[in-house]
Amino acid sequence: MNKISYNIIIYLLYYMRVLIFGHKGWIGQQIIQLLKSQNKHEFILATSRADNLEKVREEIDIVKPTNIMSFIGRTHGKIGDKEYTTIDYLEEKGKIYDNVRDNLYSPVLLGLLCNEYNIHFTYLGTGCIFEYDKEHPYNTQYNGFTEESNPNFFGSGYSVVKGFTDQLMKLINKNILNLRIRMPITDETNSRNFITKITTYNKICSVPNSMSVLTELLPMLIDMADNKITGTYNFTNPGLISHNEILEMYKEYVDKDFTWENFTIEEQNKILSAGRSNNYLDTQKLEKLYPDIKNIKDSVRDIMKNYKL
C-alpha cells in the first residue's frame, strides 16, 4: 500500500490524526489513555524535540497530522540529588534557560508551525498568570479574569514567562486553542496532583482559587480539538474552592485521621523562592460550550468519593 492510499484510509477511519508533544508527562499520559479508550482518533507520539525547528518540521511532513497537541511545560525538576516538586525549581541558578525553552519557545514554535501548515493546535497553558486586585476582589465569584484579561501576576519566573506565552498565543491566534488550567486535580495519588501535593505539605496556606478537575475537563479538551475550536478559554471548573475545603473533603471521604496546620501567606512567602498566583477565572465562555460542567466544589467532592491512594 502506498503512502497516499494509507493516508486516505486514516482520514476515513479516524476523526483526528494527532501528533502529541509532551506525551511523557503526567497530563500527556492521561490524554493518551483517554484517546486509547475512545478508540476514535489516531495519535502519534512526537519523537522530535519541540525546540528543534527543523526536526519538528520534518516530523510534521512525515506524519501529516490534522491536529497537534502540546502538553510541554516546565514546573519542576532535579538538581543534583535534590528533587524540586514546585515552580521554585525555575528560580534556581541557570534555570531561566529551561523556563524560556519549555514554557515559551517550544509551544510558540509549535503554534507558528501549525499556522504555517494550517493544522489545529491545542496548547495547554496556565491561568497562574493573574492575582486578585481591586478590580478582581479576593474570594469573590464575580468580575473574574476573562479570556481577554492580560496577566497581572509577575511574582515568579514561571508566571512571567507563561504570561508572555499566553499573549503570544493570542497574537498567533488563527489555528490555536489556548487552554488555561489551574491547580490540576485527578482521582489518583500523583506528585503532580494538587490533592496529593497539599496532603503532603507540612503547613497549608488556604486561599480560594479557580482549579481544574482534569478527570472532567480532559475529555472536553479532546472534544474541542476534534471540533477545531480555537481561541483562549479559561479551562477551570466554575466557582472557587480553598485548600481547607479540599482537605476537609479529603478527611471526610479518604482519610478520617488526616490533620493539617494552616499558616498565612506572609509566613508562606518566607519559605518559598517565588510567589504564588491566587485568582478567580471567569468560566462563562467554557460553560456556553459545556453547560453541564460541574461547579468546582461538586466536582472535587465526586473525586474524593472515588479517590485512589
Positions of the model-derived regions?
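NAD(P)H-binding glycine-rich loop region in Rossmannoid oxidoreductase-like domains
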Residues: 52-104
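NAD(P)-dependent short-chain dehydrogenase/reductase
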Residues: 155, 167-216, 223
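Mid/C-terminal beta-alpha module of Rossmann-like enzyme folds, strongest
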Residues: 220, 224-273, 277-278
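Amphipathic terminal alpha-helices
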Residues: 294-309
